[in-house]
A protein has these predicted regions:
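Substrate-binding clefts and catalytic carboxylate motifs of secreted carbohydrate-active enzymes
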Residues: 4-5, 32-167
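Acidic/polar loop patches that form or flank catalytic/metal-binding clefts of enzymes
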Residues: 8-17, 135-137
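Active-site groove signature of glycoside hydrolases
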Residues: 1
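Short, surface-exposed recognition loops and adjoining beta-strand edges that mediate ligand/DNA contacts
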Residues: 14-36
Length: 167
């Protein structure tokens, strides 16, 4: 079997944007902003992110009224999952600790308060990686379909709290 290296030995191939000379592999879930400062990397960080909840208007476009609230498995189909990299329970817990149960009374309230969680998290990612100008690329700036993770703006081009932190 011929490989790219066999056919084109002068081409550098990096098999993953998170390996080989950079620091990557998340975290991709919500962590306290202090985590980024307490766990510095000595390299450019090529992949980092957290759930990025869109505004209520976008949520209403993405989910039918029967699945808009409370959070259910349909949210999981749009990347807000209990298991896996996103770990929505961490995000929900953060929202509850910061804003109380009122933040979880409706989709509209959750979307509103989630912007602050996104802003604080993404701002901390950038500020912590600014030390010694190491740099950071988030995973990812936008999604190819309506998603609740890793985006600075949503499928309908509406900015999330992460966008405000990134500028």
């Amino acid at each position: 079997v011929m490989t790219v290296k066999d056919l084109h030995s002068d081409i550098v191939y990096i098999p993953s944007s998170a390996d080989d000379g950079v620091s990557g592999h998340g975290p991709y879930r919500a962590v306290e902003p202090s985590f980024y400062f307490e766990n510095p990397t000595s390299k450019f960080h090529s992949e980092r992110g957290m759930p990025a909840i869109m505004d209520y208007k976008s949520l209403s476009q993405m989910l039918t009224s029967g699945h808009l609230w409370p959070i259910d498995d349909v949210w999981g189909q749009h990347d807000f999952t209990r298991t896996g990299a996103q770990g929505d329970t961490a995000f929900i817990g953060m929202t509850r600790r910061r804003f109380g149960d009122q933040a979880l009374e409706s989709a509209e309230r959750f979307a509103k308060y989630a912007q602050w969680i996104n802003y604080d998290g993404y701002r901390a990612m950038y500020e912590a990686n600014n030390v010694n100008r190491k740099g950071l690329l988030i995973w990812m700036s936008h999604s190819a379909w309506p998603s609740l993770a890793w985006q600075t703006y949503d499928y309908w081009f509406r900015p999330t709290g992460a966008c405000a932190a990134a500028v």
